[in-house]
């Protein structure tokens, strides 16, 4: 490993190390928001609601592809960081090689299984009439690019795992920039419409994956793309998938709960959907910053779990303090200028009032959400597969019974408060799990919970 990477893992001041790993990830998560709206933005110029609907309907499929990537990227990434902390550099080559080619194989399976049924999958997603063919065509490009999409997720995670978060950010930035260039050319220049939007995203993922491959081939002695090293054993599979499977479940279940929430909101009409949509966009930015902070330090926690548990404890404390500062700043902003923030999106006073209320509720849950992110990342980093699995399931399903109960008791207001209640339950569960596993973590995590 390079001396600079070792410096941030082992010797730099804790806050400096935290920012080194987290800042690129924060920027990367914000870029993912831009990435998600680019296609709809450009397609919007065509003023065809069917095309916009087609792209929106494919979001669950992208979430599934991301979840499939998580099988390898989160599990193998945290395992590699732990191996580096234990100075076992040779084993990390075998882990990375297996994960890279395992991810490619998974993508090829997606092509074989899903591509022939693109029309049927589009119908299951809700596409009807003119939207059906458009959605199916978009899906076909997505499925064909699946190996590269999954590979992109894996390699981006590996860059952070070995202590090169700036490379991770550069790869994501290059992908988004290329997408911005390609979308108008393919959509308008070649008159490909929805297919052009899909191709722009696919080509961007291919280019980013190639960027990471070239980087690792030239600069890394701990990540290998040599297929001859892709030889898994029982220990390797256990270490990868005991964390990868919970990460996969979390992605799938979170998408499912989002669908359930939408169904409850739809019961109250466009007024409720619009109000929640505005508040969601506003709270998404601090939430993604906190998510980037928590996910960014996962390699740092994993590395020091094997080499310096006192430093690991200091990193966790620094992250908790940072989450607290972000939370306080956001709460002050929401309770002082929340109306004006919502007013940037609509002039309908009824929606402004409801969206402002929802914004206050969802922002109140930001602190608990952050604790949940951090402790889930901590369980992943330290290889606590059972705890990570429990958290993945809880974060995906707890909100569902809460939604039913609160909706029955308090209507739309209850639906909104259910978000805070569910986050509170998940945060308490995360703290309890970490407390129960404190001996395995071999650091006094009870201090972190008790203050």
Curated annotation (Swiss-Prot):
Q: InterPro entries under this entry?
A: MATE_fam (IPR002528), MATE_MepA-like (IPR045070), MATE_MepA_subfamily (IPR051327), MdtK-like (IPR048279)
Localization per record: Cell membrane
GO terms for biological process, alphabetical? response to antibiotic
GO molecular function: any one?
A: antiporter activity
- Where, by residue number, does the polypeptide cross the bilayer? 26-46, 52-72, 97-117, 139-159, 170-190, 194-214, 245-265, 282-302, 318-338, 355-375, 390-410, 417-437
Q: How does it sit in the membrane?
A: Multi-pass membrane protein
Q: Offer a single GO CC term for the protein.
A: plasma membrane
Keywords, in A-Z order: Antibiotic resistance, Cell membrane, Membrane, Transmembrane, Transmembrane helix, Transport
Which NCBIfam families does the UniProt entry name for this protein? matE, MATE_multi_MepA
Functional summary from the UniProt entry: Multidrug resistance efflux protein.
Q: Which family, according to UniProt?
A: Belongs to the multi antimicrobial extrusion (MATE) (TC 2.A.66.1) family. MepA subfamily.
- Which protein is depicted? Multidrug export protein MepA
Per the UniProt record, the source organism is Staphylococcus aureus (strain bovine RF122 / ET3-1)
Gene that this sequence comes from: mepA
């Amino acid at each position: 490993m390079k001396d600079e990477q070792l410096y941030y893992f082992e010797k730099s001041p804790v806050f400096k190390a935290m920012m080194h790993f987290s800042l690129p990830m924060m920027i990367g998560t914000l870029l993912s928001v831009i990435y998600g709206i680019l296609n709809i933005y450009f397609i919007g110029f065509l003023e065809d609601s069917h095309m916009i609907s087609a792209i929106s309907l494919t979001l669950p499929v992208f979430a599934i592809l991301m979840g499939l990537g998580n099988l390898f990227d989160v599990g193998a990434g945290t395992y590699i960081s732990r191996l580096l902390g234990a100075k076992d550099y040779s084993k990390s080559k075998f882990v990375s090689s297996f994960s890279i080619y395992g991810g490619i194989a998974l993508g090829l399976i997606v092509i074989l299984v899903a591509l022939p049924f693109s029309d049927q999958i589009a119908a299951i997603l809700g596409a009807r009439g003119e939207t059906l063919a458009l959605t199916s065509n978009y899906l076909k490009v997505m499925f064909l690019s699946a190996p590269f999409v999954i590979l992109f997720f894996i390699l981006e995670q590996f860059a952070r795992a070995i202590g090169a978060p700036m490379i991770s950010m550069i790869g994501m930035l290059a992908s988004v920039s290329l997408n911005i260039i390609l979308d108008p050319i393919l959509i308008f220049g070649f008159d490909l419409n929805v297919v052009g939007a899909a191709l722009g995203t696919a080509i961007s993922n291919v280019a980013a994956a190639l960027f990471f491959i070239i980087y690792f081939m030239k600069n890394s002695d701990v990540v290998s793309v040599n297929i001859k090293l892709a030889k898994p054993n029982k220990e390797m599979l256990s270490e990868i998938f005991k964390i990868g499977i919970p990460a996969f479940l979390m992605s799938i279940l979170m998408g499912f709960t989002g669908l359930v929430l939408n169904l409850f909101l739809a019961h109250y009409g466009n007024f409720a959907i619009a109000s929640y949509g505005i508040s969601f966009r506003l709270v998404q930015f601090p939430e993604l910053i906190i998510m980037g902070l928590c996910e960014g330090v996962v390699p740092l926690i994993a590395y020091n779990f094997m080499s310096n548990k006192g430093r690991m404890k200091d990193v966790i404390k620094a992250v908790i303090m940072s989450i607290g500062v972000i939370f306080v700043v956001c709460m002050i902003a929401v309770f002082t200028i929340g109306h004006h923030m919502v007013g940037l999106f609509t002039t309908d006073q009824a929606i402004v009032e409801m969206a402002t209320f929802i914004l206050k509720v969802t922002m109140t849950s930001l602190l608990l959400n952050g604790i949940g992110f951090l402790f889930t990342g901590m369980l992943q980093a330290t290889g606590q597969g059972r705890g990570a699995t429990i958290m993945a399931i809880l974060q995906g399903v707890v909100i569902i019974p809460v939604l039913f109960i609160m909706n029955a008791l308090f209507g739309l207001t209850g639906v909104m408060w259910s978000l805070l209640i569910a986050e509170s339950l998940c945060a308490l569960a995360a703290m309890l799990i970490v407390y129960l596993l404190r001996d395995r973590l071999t650091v006094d995590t009870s201090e972190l919970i008790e203050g």
